Each structure stands twice: as C-alpha cells, then as structure tokens.
Amino acid sequence: NKMLDIKFVRENPEVVKQNIRNKFQDNKLELVDKVLELDKENREIKQEVEALRAERNKISKQIGALMGQGKKEEAEEVKKQVAASGTRIEELSAREKEVEEEIKKIMMVIPNIIDPSVPIGKDDSENVEAERFGEPVVPDFEIPYHTDIMESFDGIDLDAAREVAGNGFYYLMGDIARLHSAILSYARDFMIDRGFTYCVPPFMIHGNVVNGVMSFAEMESMMYKIEGEDLYLIGTSEHSMIGKFIDSIIPEEKLPLTLTSYSPCFRKEKGAHGIEERGVYRIHQFEKQEMVVVCKPEDSMMWYDKLWKNTVDLFRSMDIPVRTLECCSGDLADLKVKSVDVEAWSPRQKKYFEVGSCSNLGDAQARRLKIRVNGEDGKKYLAHTLNNTVVAPPRMLIAFLENNLNADGTVSIPEVLRMYMGGKEKLVPKH
C-alpha cells in the first residue's frame, strides 16, 4: 500500500529525495534513509530464514537414519537443533512482519515522483498560468454578488440552510435549481458524445478505498466518516470510480477505460480556507460530473491533455471564458504526477477562480488498490489513472451567472442548455 515501489527507492534514493525537496517536504527526507535501512534488514531476514529452513530440512532428514542405526543420543541432539532453528525462524518471521509494516507506513507518505514539466513552487500562489480561452470581458454595468443575482430569481435560501445544516449548505430553488441540474445533464451528454461511459457510483466507500485513492493528509481535511461504520461520504466520484477496480486484473485490450460519473460530493473543507464567505463558493456539499480514465502508462500524458481540453470546450460552449493553471510542485497532492486547474473568469471580481482540476496520478492509485493490467505478453503491470472535473455546480454557477448576465437583470441561456431548460432563452428576474 504505497505510492512508489520500494525497488525504485532502493535504486534511486537521490531522485526520491530531490522530489521531496521539490515539494518542500524536507521533514520527510530522513524517512528515505530509514525505509532503506528497514528494506535492507527485511532482505537480510528473508535470506537468513531461507538458509535456516534449508539447513533444518537437511538435518531433520538425518534423524530417521540415526535412529535406524540405534544412535539415539545423536538423534536427540539433532532434534534439539531442529527445534532451536524452528524457534529462531519464528522470531525472525515476527520481526519480518514488523519491518514490513513499518516500511508500508513510510511508503504511504513518500510522495509520488512529479513530472519533469511541473513548475517548482511552494504553494498555490506559485501556480503558473498556461493558456487563456475566450476574452475575459468586463461589462459596462455593475454585476451584483452571485447570491444577489440568485435572489432576484427567488433562487437561493442560505438562511434556511444555515438553520437546518449550518454554514456551507444552501437551498437552490426555481429557475436557479433547474439551471444547476440542466448544466449537469448537459455535461453528462457532452461527455457521452465524446465516447465516455456514463456511470452513477456509490456515494459512500470503505476506509481501504479511501486510503487507496488519497493521502492521509487529504483524507483528514476532506472526508466525513459515518459514525460506527466503515463508511465515508465521497468527496468526489473519482473515489468510488477508481475504487471500482480494486484488486482487479484488466485485459490490456480493454484499455483505455473512459468513464464519466455523476455524484453529490461532500467535503469537510478543514484547513487553510475553511468556509467563511457567504454564498456557494466554498461549501460542504455540491454535485459533480467527473471524468475518470484507466489506461496504459505510455498513454496517460495523452489522456491528461484530452481531459482538461474537454472541460475547456464545455465552458466555452456556455460562453464562459477560462484559463488553465499549471499546479506547481508544492501544491500537488502527494499521489499526483501532474495537475492543471481550469479556472473560470469572474467579471465581477475581475479575476479567474477554480472550477475544475485535472490530474494524472501515474500508477500511485493503481499500486495502492492493486489495479493491474494483463499485457499481451502475459506480463502484468500497474495501470495509470487520471481524473478531471467536467463541471461542479453550484460553484460554477457564479461564473455562469456573471458571464451571462444582461444589463436589465435577465440571464441569457446559451443555446446548448435550452433543451434542458424547457426551451427558455433567458431567465427573467422576479424582482
């Protein structure tokens, strides 16, 4: 259960250490030396056990012969030797278990090797803009705060939600609720048209799946646990979609698996940001259309580019300008090889904000969950996994409403969404 192969660490300790430095996690450097010592001990134990077993088998064969020759005392001597090496083997095996447990623990926190193209930086403030799509226009009229736009359509009730569930929840109503669902339905069909298989997965998963798809640090800040049960609410359908392939061997000719899943998502949002602002920007519950790919290692970078481009195309089809942002080394979660955020333009704030994230996890999740491929030559190898947001309202409704708002307070419905909105071409405010 780890991100890297111990063999890789053994053969490339400096690469592993430099990668840790690049991620500004220097407190983990000593773990590399520690795990290599444990690995050495583990291999020595294995050799010793093997030698003892061979020796024991050899001498136990003498017992019968000695008894047959009436050499009883000598036979007893040999029996004692056999018993002693049996005890020693047991001691060694117990230690071996301990050592392997410790190795596993350390390997769980040694980060995956990032792609050489990833910019080096401490945190998300050092992410690098890659490309812009669509003109980030600021209109010549005042754009209200997103909840005020929603309220003009009687579309949101945050006060009632706070009474019922606390901060970070919302009631969406009327046209705004319908818009929320329409965008998800459109996103689903958009991905089906691009050849992805639609899937509705479990919205809760066991702890072993949680450990397989994310680092412990991520789990602590995101996941809600169901009291008294081995169940967690998913933070994204990626969790249950990757979990679907736990302990499996996929025939190579079945690859790539290209899936698009829908689910509600639940997040504690513990940590740096918390939930401070009024509205639907940072919330405990949202809905998401997701894409997940399981593919051959040599194809994962090609799929990575295809995935984020899908999101860009989708947002552009709804008249929302976007940009891509390369995540720097310090901002990358420990399992990720490379990641890009898709950000939508907010004409009200005159800046871009995150609406999706595309990641290549290399074989990190596959290693933890044992997702293997049966190659043409009969050799088994680990698959690569990727995930990307198609769309995750209600946060992206902020960008949708701001970019499609007109001076008279109406909101234009882009053509692609009209069939999901009962043919409406625009939303007209109630007050």
What role is predicted for each listed range?
Residues 2-136, 151, 155:
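N-terminal alpha-helical targeting/anchoring segments
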Residues 1-3, 430-431:
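Short, Lys/Arg-enriched, disordered terminal segments
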